[in-house]
Amino acid sequence: MSETAPAAPAAAPPAEKAPVKKKAAKKAGGTPRKASGPPVSELITKAVAASKERSGVSLAALKKALAAAGYDVEKNNSRIKLGLKSLVSKGTLVQTKGTGASGSFKLNKKAASGEAKPKVKKAGGTKPKKPVGAAKKPKKAAGGATPKKSAKKTPKKAKKPAAATVTKKVAKSPKKAKVAKPKKAAKSAAKAVKPKAAKPKVVKPKKAAPKKK
Protein backbone atom coordinates (compact mmCIF):
# COMPACT_ATOMS: atom_id res chain seq x y z
CA MET A 1 0.00 0.00 0.00
CA SER A 2 2.89 2.35 0.77
CA GLU A 3 4.19 1.97 -2.82
CA THR A 4 0.90 2.95 -4.56
CA ALA A 5 0.32 6.18 -2.55
CA PRO A 6 3.17 8.34 -4.03
CA ALA A 7 2.23 7.39 -7.64
CA ALA A 8 -1.11 9.28 -7.54
CA PRO A 9 0.26 12.86 -6.94
CA ALA A 10 2.84 12.41 -9.74
CA ALA A 11 0.09 11.98 -12.37
CA ALA A 12 -1.80 15.13 -11.27
CA PRO A 13 0.65 17.94 -12.40
CA PRO A 14 0.56 17.19 -16.17
CA ALA A 15 -3.24 17.46 -16.09
CA GLU A 16 -2.97 21.03 -14.70
CA LYS A 17 -0.53 22.19 -17.46
CA ALA A 18 -2.87 21.19 -20.32
CA PRO A 19 -5.52 23.93 -19.72
CA VAL A 20 -2.77 26.62 -19.68
CA LYS A 21 -1.80 25.68 -23.26
CA LYS A 22 -5.43 25.92 -24.36
CA LYS A 23 -5.72 29.44 -22.93
CA ALA A 24 -2.57 30.50 -24.76
CA ALA A 25 -3.97 29.09 -28.00
CA LYS A 26 -7.19 31.05 -27.50
CA LYS A 27 -5.26 34.29 -26.98
CA ALA A 28 -3.17 33.68 -30.10
CA GLY A 29 -6.30 32.94 -32.12
CA GLY A 30 -8.06 36.04 -30.77
CA THR A 31 -5.44 38.56 -31.95
CA PRO A 32 -6.01 38.14 -35.72
CA ARG A 33 -9.73 38.71 -35.24
CA LYS A 34 -9.07 42.24 -33.97
CA ALA A 35 -6.74 42.95 -36.90
CA SER A 36 -9.28 41.64 -39.42
CA GLY A 37 -11.65 44.56 -38.67
CA PRO A 38 -11.67 47.76 -40.77
CA PRO A 39 -9.20 50.53 -39.84
CA VAL A 40 -10.20 53.50 -37.72
CA SER A 41 -10.10 55.91 -40.66
CA GLU A 42 -12.78 53.96 -42.55
CA LEU A 43 -15.02 53.82 -39.50
CA ILE A 44 -14.63 57.57 -38.94
CA THR A 45 -15.46 58.41 -42.56
CA LYS A 46 -18.53 56.19 -42.47
CA ALA A 47 -19.72 57.79 -39.22
CA VAL A 48 -19.21 61.31 -40.59
CA ALA A 49 -20.97 60.43 -43.86
CA ALA A 50 -23.93 58.96 -41.97
CA SER A 51 -24.46 62.11 -39.89
CA LYS A 52 -26.87 64.75 -41.24
CA GLU A 53 -25.53 67.68 -39.23
CA ARG A 54 -24.61 70.66 -41.39
CA SER A 55 -22.16 72.11 -38.90
CA GLY A 56 -20.23 68.83 -38.73
CA VAL A 57 -19.84 65.92 -36.33
CA SER A 58 -18.21 66.56 -32.97
CA LEU A 59 -15.67 64.22 -31.39
CA ALA A 60 -18.20 63.08 -28.78
CA ALA A 61 -20.77 62.24 -31.48
CA LEU A 62 -18.10 60.36 -33.41
CA LYS A 63 -17.22 58.27 -30.38
CA LYS A 64 -20.89 57.44 -29.84
CA ALA A 65 -21.26 56.33 -33.47
CA LEU A 66 -18.11 54.21 -33.27
CA ALA A 67 -19.24 52.62 -30.00
CA ALA A 68 -22.60 51.81 -31.59
CA ALA A 69 -20.72 50.10 -34.45
CA GLY A 70 -18.95 47.87 -31.89
CA TYR A 71 -15.63 49.71 -31.75
CA ASP A 72 -13.87 49.96 -28.38
CA VAL A 73 -13.63 53.73 -28.00
CA GLU A 74 -12.03 53.80 -24.54
CA LYS A 75 -9.03 51.64 -25.48
CA ASN A 76 -8.56 53.21 -28.92
CA ASN A 77 -9.08 56.86 -28.00
CA SER A 78 -5.59 57.83 -29.19
CA ARG A 79 -6.13 55.97 -32.48
CA ILE A 80 -9.34 57.88 -33.11
CA LYS A 81 -7.57 61.21 -32.66
CA LEU A 82 -4.69 60.18 -34.92
CA GLY A 83 -7.15 58.95 -37.54
CA LEU A 84 -9.00 62.27 -37.48
CA LYS A 85 -5.77 64.24 -37.92
CA SER A 86 -4.62 62.05 -40.80
CA LEU A 87 -7.98 62.34 -42.58
CA VAL A 88 -7.91 66.13 -42.22
CA SER A 89 -4.34 66.28 -43.56
CA LYS A 90 -5.28 64.08 -46.55
CA GLY A 91 -8.29 66.25 -47.33
CA THR A 92 -11.00 63.62 -46.90
CA LEU A 93 -12.39 65.49 -43.86
CA VAL A 94 -12.77 69.21 -43.22
CA GLN A 95 -12.51 70.57 -39.68
CA THR A 96 -15.27 73.13 -39.24
CA LYS A 97 -14.67 73.91 -35.56
CA GLY A 98 -11.85 73.59 -33.05
CA THR A 99 -8.24 72.57 -33.56
CA GLY A 100 -6.54 69.19 -33.67
CA ALA A 101 -8.77 66.24 -32.82
CA SER A 102 -11.12 68.30 -30.64
CA GLY A 103 -13.74 69.94 -32.81
CA SER A 104 -16.34 69.09 -35.45
CA PHE A 105 -15.64 67.46 -38.78
CA LYS A 106 -17.35 67.14 -42.17
CA LEU A 107 -16.69 65.19 -45.33
CA ASN A 108 -14.84 67.08 -48.05
CA LYS A 109 -17.28 66.84 -50.97
CA LYS A 110 -14.68 68.02 -53.47
CA ALA A 111 -12.26 65.28 -52.47
CA ALA A 112 -15.01 62.64 -52.55
CA SER A 113 -16.16 63.72 -56.03
CA GLY A 114 -12.54 63.95 -57.21
CA GLU A 115 -11.91 60.38 -56.09
CA ALA A 116 -15.02 59.14 -57.89
CA LYS A 117 -14.27 60.91 -61.20
CA PRO A 118 -10.87 59.32 -61.90
CA LYS A 119 -12.39 55.90 -61.41
CA VAL A 120 -14.91 56.62 -64.15
CA LYS A 121 -12.13 57.90 -66.41
CA LYS A 122 -10.13 54.73 -65.90
CA ALA A 123 -13.13 52.57 -66.74
CA GLY A 124 -13.87 54.65 -69.82
CA GLY A 125 -10.21 54.71 -70.84
CA THR A 126 -9.95 50.93 -71.08
CA LYS A 127 -12.84 50.61 -73.54
CA PRO A 128 -11.63 53.02 -76.24
CA LYS A 129 -8.22 51.40 -76.27
CA LYS A 130 -9.65 48.44 -78.20
CA PRO A 131 -10.99 50.51 -81.12
CA VAL A 132 -7.70 52.35 -81.26
CA GLY A 133 -5.99 49.00 -81.69
CA ALA A 134 -8.52 48.13 -84.39
CA ALA A 135 -7.77 51.40 -86.15
CA LYS A 136 -4.10 50.51 -86.19
CA LYS A 137 -4.83 47.44 -88.31
CA PRO A 138 -6.01 49.46 -91.33
CA LYS A 139 -2.82 51.47 -91.02
CA LYS A 140 -0.92 48.26 -91.62
CA ALA A 141 -3.08 47.68 -94.69
CA ALA A 142 -2.27 51.20 -95.83
CA GLY A 143 1.37 50.31 -95.30
CA GLY A 144 0.76 47.35 -97.60
CA ALA A 145 -0.25 49.83 -100.31
CA THR A 146 3.32 51.12 -100.43
CA PRO A 147 4.35 48.47 -102.96
CA LYS A 148 1.75 50.00 -105.30
CA LYS A 149 3.61 53.29 -105.11
CA SER A 150 6.83 51.50 -105.92
CA ALA A 151 5.06 49.87 -108.88
CA LYS A 152 4.05 53.32 -110.10
CA LYS A 153 7.63 54.49 -109.81
CA THR A 154 8.89 51.70 -112.12
CA PRO A 155 7.37 53.27 -115.29
CA LYS A 156 9.24 56.45 -114.44
CA LYS A 157 12.42 54.44 -114.66
CA ALA A 158 11.29 53.25 -118.11
CA LYS A 159 10.78 56.89 -119.15
CA LYS A 160 14.37 57.75 -118.32
CA PRO A 161 15.70 56.22 -121.61
CA ALA A 162 13.41 58.63 -123.52
CA ALA A 163 15.03 61.48 -121.67
CA ALA A 164 18.38 60.02 -122.69
CA THR A 165 17.34 60.17 -126.36
CA VAL A 166 16.45 63.83 -125.91
CA THR A 167 19.89 64.46 -124.52
CA LYS A 168 21.41 62.70 -127.54
CA LYS A 169 19.44 64.95 -129.90
CA VAL A 170 20.57 67.98 -127.96
CA ALA A 171 24.11 66.70 -128.24
CA LYS A 172 23.74 66.33 -132.03
CA SER A 173 22.51 69.90 -132.50
CA PRO A 174 25.69 71.52 -131.14
CA LYS A 175 27.65 69.46 -133.70
CA LYS A 176 25.77 71.27 -136.49
CA ALA A 177 26.56 74.54 -134.84
CA LYS A 178 30.22 73.58 -134.76
CA VAL A 179 30.13 72.93 -138.53
CA ALA A 180 28.60 76.36 -139.10
CA LYS A 181 31.29 78.11 -137.06
CA PRO A 182 34.14 77.38 -139.52
CA LYS A 183 32.03 78.87 -142.36
CA LYS A 184 31.71 82.10 -140.44
CA ALA A 185 35.40 81.99 -139.83
CA ALA A 186 36.00 81.55 -143.60
CA LYS A 187 33.74 84.52 -144.38
CA SER A 188 35.54 86.66 -141.89
CA ALA A 189 38.86 85.60 -143.45
CA ALA A 190 37.60 86.55 -146.93
CA LYS A 191 36.49 89.92 -145.63
CA ALA A 192 39.90 90.39 -144.12
CA VAL A 193 41.59 89.58 -147.48
CA LYS A 194 39.57 92.24 -149.41
CA PRO A 195 41.18 95.23 -147.73
CA LYS A 196 44.57 93.78 -148.61
CA ALA A 197 43.60 93.90 -152.33
CA ALA A 198 42.51 97.52 -151.90
CA LYS A 199 45.95 98.59 -150.80
CA PRO A 200 47.51 98.34 -154.31
CA LYS A 201 44.61 100.47 -155.64
CA VAL A 202 45.71 103.24 -153.34
CA VAL A 203 49.21 103.12 -154.85
CA LYS A 204 47.82 104.28 -158.28
CA PRO A 205 49.37 107.82 -158.06
CA LYS A 206 52.49 106.31 -159.67
CA LYS A 207 50.98 107.55 -163.02
CA ALA A 208 53.42 110.50 -162.90
CA ALA A 209 55.63 108.57 -165.32
CA PRO A 210 54.12 110.25 -168.42
CA LYS A 211 55.67 113.52 -167.31
CA LYS A 212 59.07 112.06 -168.23
CA LYS A 213 57.94 111.85 -171.87
Curated annotation (Swiss-Prot):
Indicate the transmembrane segments per the record: none
Where on the chain is N6-(2-hydroxyisobutyryl)lysine found, per UniProt? Answer: 23, 26-27, 46, 52, 63-64, 75, 81, 85, 90, 97, 110, 117, 121, 129, 136, 148, 159, 168, 213
The UniProt regions of compositional bias labelled Basic residues, in chain numbering, are 119-140, 149-160, 169-186, 193-213
Which Gene3D superfamilies does this one have?
Winged helix-like DNA-binding domain superfamily/Winged helix DNA-binding domain
Task: Enumerate composition-biased segments (Low complexity).
Answer: 1-17
Residues modified as N6-methyllysine are K34, K187
Can you tell me which residues the record assigns to a coiled coil? Answer: none
Region spans: Disordered: 1-41, 92-213
Modification N6-crotonyllysine occurs at: K34, K64, K85, K90, K97, K159, K168
Q: Keyword Transcription, does the record have it?
A: no
Positions of modified residues (Phosphothreonine): T146
- Modification type N6-acetyllysine: residues: K17
Annotated Gene Ontology cellular components are: euchromatin; nucleosome; nucleus
| Keywords noted in UniProt | Acetylation, ADP-ribosylation, Chromosome, Citrullination, DNA-binding, Hydroxylation, Methylation, Nucleus, Phosphoprotein
Name positions with the PTM Phosphoserine: S2, S104
Residue positions, PTM Citrulline: R54
- Quote the PTM field: H1 histones are progressively phosphorylated during the cell cycle, becoming maximally phosphorylated during late G2 phase and M phase, and being dephosphorylated sharply thereafter.
Query: At which residues is ADP-ribosylserine found?
Result: S188
Q: What does this protein do?
A: Histone H1 protein binds to linker DNA between nucleosomes forming the macromolecular structure known as the chromatin fiber. Histones H1 are necessary for the condensation of nucleosome chains into higher-order structured fibers. Also acts as a regulator of individual gene transcription through chromatin remodeling, nucleosome spacing and DNA methylation.
The record comments on the domains as follows: The C-terminal domain is required for high-affinity binding to chromatin.
Q: Oligomeric state and partners?
A: Interacts with TSC22D1 isoforms 2 and 5.
Homology family: Belongs to the histone H1/H5 family.
Q: What is this protein called?
A: Histone H1.2
